[in-house]
Regions:
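Catalytic-loop region of hydrolases
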Residues: 2-4, 9-12, 27-78
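Short beta-strand element of the alpha/beta-hydrolase
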Residues: 68-70, 81-94
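Alpha/beta-hydrolase active-site loop
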Residues: 140-161
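C-terminal catalytic histidine-bearing segment of alpha/beta-hydrolase fold enzymes
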Residues: 283-294, 313, 320, 327-328, ...
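Short beta-strand/loop motif that positions the catalytic acidic residue
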Residues: 306, 311-318
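Primarily recognizes the serine-hydrolase "nucleophile elbow" in alpha/beta-hydrolase
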Residues: 155-224
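Conserved alpha/beta-hydrolase
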Residues: 90, 95-96, 101-133
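Accessory cap/linker subdomain of secreted extracellular hydrolases
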Residues: 202-303
Length: 371
């Protein structure tokens, strides 16, 4: 049933709060969805209300499992037809239950970015991904888990009386770019999440298998976060095929990958003490004997017959996720999908987060034309 815990700090406009309280205490359309108000400390300053959504999605085995999301509403009353919906696919935070973004303060970068989105009149739905915030551990970069977490969140929020328009656009950054495209890959235009009109992705890891193989090499360079990214990938591969991963880790790698299961990004990066991804495996040139095949099993996307426009952005100075294959991936999408518009925008001199921020004016233009 619906759970309501009104906190005035999380709902700042008195008349709106009373209307929202009436909405949240209305009977639910399904017993599998519950809502309440999130702590204001975990919200965006520009949001008039922050709502916690609990719903059912799929875990890494394809079984029904609980998931959580934050829904952030813009100031003012909804327009006729409801607020247009932006779905936020977040980047890497970790794979442990306690890393769920909806239960942590938002970063300064995200507060600024989504302050503009909310101020422009869009509601923001932000799934945590299954396993974050609901126990069980998140299967990192798992196409099924990420894609279903997003699509099922949209379907779930539609069972509530919150006034949202039918159309929605997904925005993803870094790992979230893969999550956003996972949702596009699994999207059914006749299903309960119908109305997807576009995707905007930045910091995309294109050609995942080869790019990760390069990241593991002893000669690789890049940000300090890369060893944590590598460990999270190895946790996901262990979940799929432990016998294909664990025997090929170094002594340090076994301890560090075990730590990755319970440690969020910043702390896990610090625990590496400057080591590179190569330190995790016995053979940095071949992290595991079936590495690229297993990465493909985990992360592969449908890239043909996609039904919606896609905007891709990248920074030329990105050292977290090298944009080596981004333009090539955009060319592939255009060739494979001649009936949609695929744009690739280059942000000179911008790093991983910088490209995300630099893309905001283009993203707002995309939202105006697709919502």
């Amino acid at each position: 049933m619906f759970a309501l815990s009104l906190r005035t700090a999380a709902c700042r406009v008195a008349v709106f709060c009373l209307a929202l309280a009436a909405v949240l205490t209305s009977p639910p359309a399904t017993a599998e969805v519950s809502v309440g108000l999130l702590d204001a400390a975990w919200s965006f300053p520009a949001a008039a209300a922050a709502i916690e959504l609990r719903y059912t999605t799929a875990n890494r085995y394809g079984q029904a499992a609980p998931a959580s999301a934050g829904l952030y509403l813009p100031p003012g009353l909804p327009p006729a037809g409801g607020w247009p919906l932006v779905v936020w696919a977040h980047g890497t935070v970790g794979v442990a239950d306690g890393c769920a973004p909806s239960h942590h303060p938002q970063s300064e970068r995200n507060r600024g970015y989504f302050g503009e989105i909310l101020g422009s009149g869009y509601a923001v739905l932000a799934p945590d991904y299954q396993g974050l915030g609901t126990g069980g551990g998140f299967s990192y970069y798992n196409t099924l888990v990420e894609g279903r977490s997003i699509l099922d969140a949209v379907a779930a929020v539609r069972t509530t009386p919150v006034p949202l328009s039918r159309n929605w656009v997904v925005i993803g950054q870094s790992e979230g770019s893969h999550a956003a495209l996972s949702a596009v890959s699994l999207y059914d235009p006749t299903g309960p999440a119908a109305g997807l009109n576009g995707a905007v992705v930045t910091g995309l890891r294109a050609n995942t298998g080869p790019s990760l193989r390069e990241m593991f090499r002893s000669s690789s360079t890049g940000s300090a976060n890369q060893i944590a990214y590598a460990a999270y990938f190895l946790t996901a591969l262990q979940q799929l095929h432990p016998d294909r991963v664990t025997p090929f880790l170094s002594d340090f790698g076994r301890d560090y990958v075990a730590q990755a299961n319970s440690t969020c990004l910043a702390d896990l990066t610090a625990a590496a003490a400057g080591r590179r991804p190569a330190a995790l495996v016995a053979d940095p040139d071949s992290p595991t004997p079936t590495f690229e095949a297993d990465i493909a099993e985990l992360t592969d996307l449908r890239t043909e017959q996609l039904p919606i426009d896609i905007a891709i952005g990248y920074g030329t100075a990105d050292i977290d996720v090298a944009p080596t294959w981004t333009e090539q991936f955009g060319d592939h999408l255009r060739t494979a999908n001649p009936d949609i518009q695929v744009t690739v925008t280059r942000y000179p001199g911008k790093d991983h987060s910088g490209a995300f921020l630099a893309s905001l004016p283009d993203t707002l233009g995309f939202l105006r034309s697709h919502l």
